[in-house]
Every structure is written in structure tokens, then in C-alpha cells.
Design a protein with these regions (language model features):
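Binding-site signature for planar aromatic cofactors or substrates
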Residues: 1-135
């Protein structure tokens, strides 16, 4: 996840069990991102805007990919133009302690290799749960 400026964010979408975000962005570019504080200071931050999704063959993907570490399972880059920011108290958000990142996804992707990842997309990620096409 990268902040480009006060009105633009981008993130690398990794291969997973579904491709829901991409499918829904093809139908409607509106997106909401929510951040929660799980430590001492309660807070919820929401970013509202419109997003574009770029696949590895897109020029924007090639340009933005330089911002991220290389992941075998990289599927798309999502770029969101922020048009509204909202905060709320976060009083109902529980305390949670961060332990560490999980490594299984990247390890699994490395075993599949890039060709195996692309086959996984064909086998598992061509439609959303609603039946919408994905990229």
C-alpha cells in the first residue's frame, strides 16, 4: 500500500482465492477503504473515491510496479483517487496485538511459479462470486 499524494493511493493486489475487487471495479469504480486502530488510540479512518485496476500488460501497471517489492503472485495494481476522507471514534474496535506477517501466500506462489499463477487465475479467478467477469 503506497500513498502517492494527498489524493491518490495505490496497492498491489496479490493472487488469492478470489478476484472480487477487480470484478466489482469493472462494474463500478467506486471504492471505500477502511483503516482501524487496534491499539491505545481508538480511530476509524475511511477513504472514499474511485479506483482503476491495472493488469501487468497495462502501461500504468508497468510504471507503478516499481513502487513495490517483487511478488510472484502479483495480480493487479489498484489506483484510487480519493475524493472524501472521514474519521469516526472507533470505540467499538477491539484491542488486538500484531504478531507478524504470514508467509504462506508468497511461499505457495513461489512454488507455483509465474506460469502456475497464471494457470491458477484461469482455473479459479475468471469470475466473481456474483458471476462478474474479472481481469
Amino acid at each position: 500500500f503506497k500513498v502517492i499524494d494527498t489524493k491518490k493511493i495505490v496497492w498491489l493486489n496479490l493472487t488469492g482465492s478470489g478476484n472480487e475487487t477487480a470484478a466489482h471495479l469493472l462494474k463500478n469504480k467506486r471504492m471505500t477503504i477502511m483503516f482501524c486502530s487496534f491499539d491505545e488510540t481508538p480511530l476509524i479512518l475511511r477513504l472514499y473515491g474511485n479506483a482503476n485496476i491495472y493488469h501487468e500488460s497495462d502501461q500504468e501497471y508497468i510504471k507503478l510496479k516499481k513502487l513495490f517489492k517483487n511478488f510472484t503472485g502479483a495480480r493487479q495494481i489498484i489506483e484510487m483517487d480519493i475524493n472524501q476522507v472521514q474519521t469516526s471514534c472507533g470505540y467499538a474496535v477491539p484491542f488486538m496485538e500484531y504478531k507478524q506477517e504470514r508467509t504462506q501466500l508468497n511461499e505457495s506462489d513461489l512454488k507455483k511459479g509465474r506460469d502456475g499463477i497464471k494457470q491458477y487465475w484461469k482455473d479459479h479467478n475468471t469470475k466473481s462470486l456474483d458471476g462478474f467477469e474479472t481481469i
